[in-house]
Amino acid sequence: MKIVFMGTPDFAVPCLKALVENGHEIPAVFTQPDRPKGRGYKMIPPSVKKCAEEYSIPVFQPLSLRKGEDAEKSMTALREISPELIIVVAYGQILPKEVLELPKYGCINIHASLLPEYRGAAPIQRCILDGK
């Protein structure tokens, strides 16, 4: 199956690896742009980008999928790829309706906790703090 993967942190890497290792065609990975980190503000690529590069999968890093030149380029690429499915794991952006309607079989979002109760940047920690 032709699957576009969208994810960013370490949490998303096992899902990407499982898709590749189980023979799915992954024509593209979308992830957040590299960000400066540490004292020297060295640009660090997201974990998903590093994983995709290990498998020689093309990587897209748009600032936004909703507006601007990045969004237009990303939509053009997605239309050309024509994915059967998009899998989203901790991507860090809300997908516009146009992206959600593009794949033949739709989109699947994998989240680290119950939604909508534990949405946001620290869902696992919030579950633990609530004793769940």
What is each PLM-predicted segment?
Residues 1-132:
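One-carbon transfer enzymes
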